[in-house]
């Protein structure tokens, strides 16, 4: 009686996976192996600008165990593949955020955390410096609404990002083009002149003292200021005479 190991299979039959082979060999594809390695070792770049980052700091403690997802916080964008934006993004900070994103290695992912990051939050109605959504600057993969969102919501976002990475295909990477960029013509940001030019003390209003101060310390008052003061005094006198 022959054992199963020494049994000779008929070569004309359909190929079958024996029990010994299925118990000792893992069958997969390069694409699945690549996605498994990516989603199991995400290295986030922590980008916190406001109070939402306090909730994210709770993830680093032992209660929520940030490391069980394989996440290793990085301080340099060149070694990170995930950026978590938490807090308000201002017009002045927008170019720095875009530069950090550009320095990250491909493939890279973005998680927008909090209402201020997603839509501007409470600053979206009357603020002239808040960016109304970080997706106007960089492409966002997962949104976390809340003001601020709880650590459990952050964990759920990480799980959703891992599922998204697991469903990716290496052959479609060329189609995933980034459409939202700070320097393109598609954005709705309006260029404004710089406020701090370094020439504030060199301006004419700062070089010459006020006429009241110049007259008090004995400095000569410019004729233009004297004429303006005379006309103003004459108008005040006419107003008083008309009232009488």
UniProtKB/Swiss-Prot annotation:
It is a peripheral membrane protein. Binds 1 [4Fe-4S] cluster. It comes from the Bacteria. It catalyses: a plastoquinone + NADH + (n+1) H(+)(in) = a plastoquinol + NAD(+) + n H(+)(out); a plastoquinone + NADPH + (n+1) H(+)(in) = a plastoquinol + NADP(+) + n H(+)(out). The keyword Thylakoid applies. GO terms for biological process: aerobic respiration; electron transport coupled proton transport; photosynthesis, light reaction. It holds the Pfam family Oxidored_q6. One of its GO terms (cellular component) is plasma membrane-derived thylakoid membrane. [4Fe-4S] cluster binds at residues 51-52, 116, 147. One of its GO terms (molecular function) is NADH dehydrogenase (ubiquinone) activity. It is an enzyme of class 7 (translocase). Its EC number is 7.1.1.-. PANTHER family: NADH DEHYDROGENASE, NADH DEHYDROGENASE [UBIQUINONE] IRON-SULFUR PROTEIN 7, MITOCHONDRIAL. NDH-1 shuttles electrons from an unknown electron donor, via FMN and iron-sulfur (Fe-S) centers, to quinones in the respiratory and/or the photosynthetic chain. The immediate electron acceptor for the enzyme in this species is believed to be plastoquinone. Couples the redox reaction to proton translocation, and thus conserves the redox energy in a proton gradient. Cyanobacterial NDH-1 also plays a role in inorganic carbon-concentration. This is NAD(P)H-quinone oxidoreductase subunit K. It comes from Synechococcus sp. (strain JA-2-3B'a(2-13)).
């Amino acid at each position: 009686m022959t054992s199963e190991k020494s049994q000779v299979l008929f070569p004309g039959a359909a190929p079958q996976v024996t029990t010994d082979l299925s118990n000792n060999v893992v069958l997969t594809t390069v694409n699945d192996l690549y996605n498994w390695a990516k989603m199991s070792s995400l290295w986030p770049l922590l980008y916190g600008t406001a109070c939402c980052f306090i909730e994210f700091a709770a993830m680093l403690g032992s209660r929520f165990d940030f490391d069980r997802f394989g996440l290793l916080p990085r301080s340099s964008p060149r070694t990170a593949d995930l950026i978590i934006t938490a807090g308000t993004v201002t017009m002045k900070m927008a170019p720095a955020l875009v530069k950090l994103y550009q320095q990250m290695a491909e493939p890279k992912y973005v998680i927008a955390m909090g209402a201020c990051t997603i839509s501007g939050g409470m600053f979206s109605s009357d603020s002239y410096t808040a960016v109304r959504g970080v997706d106007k600057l960089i492409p966002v993969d997962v949104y976390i609404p809340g003001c601020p969102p709880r650590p459990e919501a952050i964990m759920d976002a990480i799980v959703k990002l891992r599922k998204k990475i697991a469903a990716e295909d290496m052959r479609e990477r060329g189609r995933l083009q980034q459409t939202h960029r700070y320097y393109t013509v598609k954005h709705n940001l309006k260029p404004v002149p710089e406020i701090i030019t370094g020439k504030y003390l060199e301006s004419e209003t700062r070089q010459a003292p006020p006429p009241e101060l110049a007259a008090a310390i004995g400095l000569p008052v410019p004729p233009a200021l004297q004429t303006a003061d005379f006309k103003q005094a004459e108008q005040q006198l006419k107003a008083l005479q008309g009232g009488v």
